[in-house]
Amino acid sequence: MTQALQALIDQAWEDRTSLSPKSAPNDIREAVANVIGQLDAGTLRVAEKQGKDWIVNQWVKKAVLLSFRLEDNAPMSAGGFAQFYDKVPTKFANWSGDDFAKAGFRVVPPAVARRGSFIAKNAVLMPSYVNIGAYVDEGTMVDTWATVGSCAQIGKNVHLSGGVGIGGVLEPLQANPVIIEDNCFIGARSEVVEGVIVEENSVISMGVYLGQSTKIYDRETGEIHYGRVPAGSVVVAGNLPSKDGKYSLYCAVIVKKVDAQTRAKTSLNDLLRGD
């Protein structure tokens, strides 16, 4: 089933310039709708960890992009207090109280999640935004005005602080999604974009910006990482001097490994999660 679905999506991707809401064949529509439905239910993911490596299902990302070719914009109501005009419906548009109870997470108004995103049990969405294809795992808090970009993968027991930006893959087009692994803390107003991976148990301080070209300097070893924060790192904003010493450029600095003191400052509050 999955192989046939993948083959259909891959072929549709090759023919994408000829697709439109009026011309798309039914089998393509059904295939894309199938993928979006599975993403919404959490039974399919854009990226999955196999062993120590993350494997990106590029065909799933293609299906997300194709969905924008297959739908016209349409008016959408948000509880009668706001109107939107978009191609992608909101995740909770037709949910009942029973649906929310079964899903087991909290949504604080006016948080928005698009259909095709997945939110796991005991997660908390403060007034925030979760885009299509994103996966937010158990016990994670998406704090006020944080954004989880398209196809981003957020692990278990993660805290995305106020105003955090997690980049997406749709525009500008990125090869791989941003991945925040389990038990990470991302400080207020930090940005993680361009497919950067923050490995498990790491703490990113307030106001740190991470992209593929950002130097991530380990002050203990002198090593410089790109596109990956090693597991258990505590990272702050900093700068490194140029070779000629005339100027310095922004970087992120690994100042230490997570210890008990760090954990005490960034621990999650169980009172905010669960039933």
UniProtKB/Swiss-Prot annotation:
EC number(s) stated in the UniProt entry for this protein: 2.3.1.117
InterPro entries: DapD_Trfase_Hexpep_rpt_fam, Hexapep, Hexapep_transf_CS, THP_succinylTrfase_dom1, THP_succinylTrfase_N_sf, Trimer_LpxA-like_sf
Catalysed conversion reaction: (S)-2,3,4,5-tetrahydrodipicolinate + succinyl-CoA + H2O = (S)-2-succinylamino-6-oxoheptanedioate + CoA
Compartments (UniProt record): Cytoplasm
Record keywords, A-Z: Acyltransferase, Amino-acid biosynthesis, Cytoplasm, Diaminopimelate biosynthesis, Lysine biosynthesis, Repeat, Transferase
A single GO BP: lysine biosynthetic process via diaminopimelate
Name of the protein in question: 2,3,4,5-tetrahydropyridine-2,6-dicarboxylate N-succinyltransferase
Species annotation: Cupriavidus taiwanensis (strain DSM 17343 / BCRC 17206 / CCUG 44338 / CIP 107171 / LMG 19424 / R1) (Ralstonia taiwanensis (strain LMG 19424))
